[in-house]
Amino acid sequence: MKLDAPFNLDPNVKVRTRFAPSPTGYLHVGGARTALYSWLYAKHNNGEFVLRIEDTDLERSTPEATAAIIEGMEWLNLPWEHGPYYQTKRFDRYNQVIDEMIEQGLAYRCYCTKEHLEELRHTQEQNKEKPRYDRHCLHDHNHSPDEPHVVRFKNPTEGSVVFDDAVRGRIEISNSELDDLIIRRTDGSPTYNFCVVVDDWDMGITHVVRGEDHINNTPRQINILKAIGAPIPTYAHVSMINGDDGQKLSKRHGAVSVMQYRDDGYLPEALINYLVRLGWGHGDQEIFSREEMINYFELDHVSKSASAFNTEKLQWLNQHYIRELPPEYVAKHLEWHYKDQSIDTSNGPALTDIVSMLAERCKTLKEMASSSRYFFEEFETFDEAAAKKHFKGNAAEALAKVKEKLTALSSWNLHSIHEAIEQTAAELEVGMGKVGMPLRVAVTGSGQSPSMDVTLVGIGRDRVLVRIQRAIDFIHAQNA
């Protein structure tokens, strides 16, 4: 049987991996980790990475899901050398191989009705036998190929399938446990397990990194590969990701979609760093640059045990990257969140300044955008608890005094603003907090912000003075 090689593959590449999601939903964190491990292994070995969309499930696959998967891969910055390839565009190739297999006696047409198969299964269950096809049609030549039928792979009946999993070690499955797998449906469409085999062959895949839920497919796929004379890739089945309660990760544990983490304010570097450590390690190191991941990653260091997703750890990593990455880079991601929250940033400080001001305070970019709205827009009301706590006593007098000094400043900068607040406190013979806290509530609407000099510079003189007067009027109205 001949290899179909339309992909312009470099024959000198020794390692070629793939990520092959089904477009029936978003890119979830488990799939993203599998893609990351596959990508890292290729990069570590100077190999190539293939993106393949396994869209043979015509009822459940959608263009929207495909777009979401590609968007997630691009956001995570996991570029591919080949693809995306779509299985639905390769049906002719799959059917060509199936027809050749029938000719060579490696597969056969099965005309059994649904009723016959159900009766067979019922009988086997009654006899406490393993449900499997009885090869009724293997030697039945009384039907025309034009009659409705499926095509089954003629699986070996003796011996075992043995493979050395790069994560789990040697795995052996007796062929007596395997059925004659359907490789083409009645409607003429090839099945998932068969398409995967032909694709891995044609695309020169040397290493298959995928979830442990695919282990049962592997012996079936290996037998087909052997039958058609194709090389057998190395398989690596990675463990599942659980929630912190030990149950399989699902929506009830929080976000599971990669793009939901983007929406929630996480940087791709944080999610990548978190996912790589979720089942793999290099000593006690927690924080890895992309280059370090590529240099250190090996499949035999991937854990066999399930990993527990810990959102607090992810938040810690996210805050680290918000602090440590260049403000210009973080600002590009922050800009998306301002747009998402309908905050117009055209009249206010540079976003790089926002990042510098709030990097130590915010765990997510979503929080950074929402908590800095006052730099760009007017707020409607003062935070009730903050106003009750700080708009009392001599707060109005302190605000009037500091407004007077701020108005008189010839230069609006950190030093001059700090001096104005300090002088106001000295003249009123009160602590800095008695001036600073009412001022903070007055100009931000809340009791939390960066230092007052930084905050006032960011808001701008005109807005600051208007807001202070608004707060004074509010206090007088409350006391009237």
Curated annotation (Swiss-Prot):
- Catalyzed reactions per annotation: tRNA(Glu) + L-glutamate + ATP = L-glutamyl-tRNA(Glu) + AMP + diphosphate
Query: What is the cofactor note?
Result: Binds 1 zinc ion per subunit.
User: What protein am I looking at?
Assistant: Glutamate--tRNA ligase
- Report residues binding Zn(2+): 110, 112, 137, 139
User: What would be one Gene Ontology cellular-component term for the protein?
Assistant: cytosol
Q: What is its EC number?
A: 6.1.1.17
Could you give a GO molecular-function term held by this entry?
Answer: zinc ion binding
Chain span(s) of sequence motif 'KMSKS' region: 248-252
Question: In which compartments does the protein localize?
Answer: Cytoplasm
Q: What are the entry keywords?
A: Aminoacyl-tRNA synthetase, ATP-binding, Cytoplasm, Ligase, Metal-binding, Nucleotide-binding, Protein biosynthesis, Zinc
State one Pfam family annotation.
tRNA-synt_1c
Provide the residue positions that the database annotates as binding ATP: 251
UniProt keyword Aminoacyl-tRNA synthetase present: yes
Lineage start: Bacteria, Pseudomonadati, Pseudomonadota, Gammaproteobacteria, Pasteurellales
Q: Where is this motif: 'HIGH' region?
A: 21-31
Kindly indicate whether the keyword Nucleotide-binding belongs to this entry.
Answer: yes
